[in-house]
């Protein structure tokens, strides 16, 4: 399993959820197929016909808000900086797939894929582009992972408490002088592989027990640094969770990625992104399908049910 995160309260569910999960995309609902609901509940539903306009997944470029119809998903080619005026920006309601575990299933008919940046090659990204998909590069920004190839580049004094996942420790995000070149290298990797955007994970460390006296101000500085590093390379960037800081950060990020806002009654807090015509890519794990799809559509979220291990299985609204 790759190093993706859920809330600390779901760690027990995460461990249980790795058992008994098939990798069949859009397959049977785990509750219907005998998988315990605590393993990885999510949601069912059928695609919204109103979302067909986003089938091709172009979204909008920034800042003009008008997509260039002549630009294919991979027209810039791997390793090429896109001008800021042509940076991809997905629109609300754009359908997506989020797969961080296992070989990427390219058959899912959605315009946006979010996949692990380290574990997937430029060839995989190009293959998705050839199918007309935009591709988001998942990286861990807020924690050190001992299984990544650059793990030795992180000074020991920057490593804090374990974040609840084996082999991972919170980073001291106050040290922008050290972390900026390390994060720049990761985002540059995404650019060279041809990704269209970046999803930096663990961008709300200040609300956790990290081993460092992190504040909201430290988090804002770190998150804005990440956004600038992506934008400087022509990549879009998504804000992961961090609901409390959306009012301050919505202008710095091109879309949002959220886990379980419906579970905790917080989806309305993502409205600033939708109001700015920016997509909110949203998943639920522990709710029944009919518990959040109606509200998700009302709010303009791009919502689906996923298992906690984030294999290819999905149930979109």
Positions of predicted regions on the chain:
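Intrinsically disordered, low-complexity regulatory segments
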Residues: 12-16
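Glycan-processing catalytic domains of CAZymes
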Residues: 2-11, 22-34, 76-317
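N-terminal low-complexity, Pro/Thr-rich disordered segments
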Residues: 18-89
């Amino acid at each position: 399993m790759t190093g993706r995160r859920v809330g600390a309260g779901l760690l027990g569910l995460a461990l249980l959820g790795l058992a008994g999960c098939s990798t069949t995309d859009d397959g049977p609902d785990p509750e219907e197929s005998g998988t315990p609901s605590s393993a990885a509940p999510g949601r069912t539903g059928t695609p919204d016909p109103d979302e067909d306009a986003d089938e091709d997944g172009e979204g909008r470029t920034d800042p003009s808000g008008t997509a260039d119809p002549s630009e294919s998903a991979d027209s810039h080619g791997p390793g090429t900086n896109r001008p800021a005026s042509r940076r991809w920006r997905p629109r609300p309601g754009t359908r997506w797939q989020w797969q961080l575990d296992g070989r990427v299933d390219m058959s899912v008919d959605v315009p946006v894929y979010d996949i692990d940046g380290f574990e997937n090659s430029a060839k995989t990204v190009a293959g998705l582009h050839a199918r007309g998909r935009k591709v988001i590069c998942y990286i861990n920004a807020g924690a050190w992972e001992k299984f990544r190839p650059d793990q030795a580049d992180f000074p020991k004094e920057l490593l804090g408490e374990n974040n609840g996942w084996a082999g991972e420790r919170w980073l001291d995000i106050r040290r922008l002088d050290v972390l900026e070149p390390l994060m720049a290298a990761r985002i540059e990797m995404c650019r060279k592989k041809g990704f269209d955007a970046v999803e930096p994970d663990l961008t709300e460390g200040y609300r956790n027990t990290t081993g460092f006296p992190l504040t909201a101000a430290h988090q804002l500085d770190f998150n804005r640094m990440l956004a600038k590093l992506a934008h400087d390379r022509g990549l879009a960037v998504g804000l992961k969770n961090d609901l409390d800081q959306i009012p301050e950060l919505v202008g710095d990020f091109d879309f949002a990625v959220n886990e379980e806002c419906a579970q905790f009654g917080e989806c309305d807090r993502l409205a600033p992104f939708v109001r700015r015509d920016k997509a909110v890519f949203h998943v639920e794990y522990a709710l029944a399908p009919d518990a959040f799809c109606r509200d998700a559509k009302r709010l303009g979220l791009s919502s689906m049910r996923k298992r906690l291990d984030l294999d290819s299985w999905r149930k979109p609204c």
